[in-house]
Amino acid sequence: MAKQKPVLNVAFIGHVDAGKSTTVGRLLYDSGAIDPQLLEKLKREAQERGKAGFEFAYVMDNLKEERERGVTIDVAHKKFETQKYEVTIVDCPGHRDFIKNMITGASQADAAVLVVDVNDAKTGIQPQTREHMFLARTLGIKQIAVAINKMDTVNYSQEEYEKMKKMLSEQLLKVLGYNPDQIDFIPTASLKGDNVVKRSENMPWYKGPTLVEALDKFQPPEKPTNLPLRIPIQDVYSITGVGTVPVGRVETGILRPGDKVVFEPAGVSGEVKSIEMHHEQIPQAEPGDNIGFNVRGVSKKDIKRGDVCGHPDNPPTVAEEFTAQIVVLQHPTAITVGYTPVFHAHTAQVACTFIELLKKLDPRTGQVIEENPQFLKTGDAAIVKIKPTKPMVIENVREIPQLGRFAIRDMGMTIAAGMAIDVKAKNK
């Protein structure tokens, strides 16, 4: 079997109208990741509807429609291969969904591609673009590439490209602590295919990489195998003749059969008999592996979704209270002391109370602008103290980043996002 390419999770971010989904579609289409049979079917339909010459946008619309109708399209649709990587695209259609996904780590991205419309040079950087980039920074995404898109609408002008590049560099990237000299700015026209996978003949002045080549310049993620074991539990099954089988994704550390494990905040422990991935037994599980593991000495009723598995010598931290840095994404009024929304951290969902508002920060620079603010509103960044209403595991983001991030939800929407920067552990 050929050695598998390393997986790279790439988030596509930017304003909704910058052509993100077209860029993603073009990447998938030109790198042959869309199922050929589906393409044939769509081509035929395009011809029947008099759209001969096979409109790319038509394919994208149909993929979108198929998604909306709930028809599962070949999963290849969200993955494609470059020379170096198997790339998984974390493309988030809805702005708020995107933010929640990015923060809860469900789709912890290794790198991001910021897609902007070259025409924004005239109007200024879109607020949503700023917010996405700030979040990418807050979440520790260090590697980014920029696609300056819709170049076809400015006649592939180098001057317009340079204007946009300068504006992004000075007003956004440098402010957030990125070094523009280490970032590829690729002039693209996704609808036409320029510089996404295929090199454009319309911009001979551009000598840099295509978007796909820029992805290959990213560094692969280090697997956090040296950190303590943490497996947030997604489900627990009781299988006849086998016993209790918790299921989850290994976030950090290594799990092997024979290991003694402890589940928190449940406070129960047992011994691992076997580990399965994709219905095959494996000798050890590493970060990124979605596994089921059979545990002796634990019953199904002892543990549940939201518990975290670790080794007894370094068990998951159950928080009495914690200090967090948050960004308020949307709140109809204001957040004050006593507010108790639901925190989504790894697989846990626990109501937590704001017990102190310590500092208000400038969301663009992180500088303190007010000590002990009375309230927080949409757009504010802050440092706050939080008390869970019932036991939950959360880790200091500086020690185990994979379990240090969370989203805050209330009234059916994501109110805020953040990370734990100090955790006071519960005394046993």
UniProtKB/Swiss-Prot annotation:
Residues 91-94 are annotated as: G3. Residues 70-74 are annotated as: G2. GO terms for cellular component: cytoplasm. Residues 5-225 form the tr-type G domain. Keywords: Cytoplasm, Elongation factor, GTP-binding, Hydrolase, Magnesium, Metal-binding, Nucleotide-binding, Protein biosynthesis. CDD domains: EF1_alpha, EF1_alpha_II, EF1_alpha_III. Residues 189-191 are annotated as: G5. It is found in: Cytoplasm. Its EC number is 3.6.5.3. GO terms for molecular function: GTP binding; GTPase activity; translation elongation factor activity. It catalyses: GTP + H2O = GDP + phosphate + H(+). Residues 149-152 are annotated as: G4. It is an enzyme of class 3 (hydrolase). This is Elongation factor 1-alpha. It comes from Methanocaldococcus jannaschii (strain ATCC 43067 / DSM 2661 / JAL-1 / JCM 10045 / NBRC 100440) (Methanococcus jannaschii).
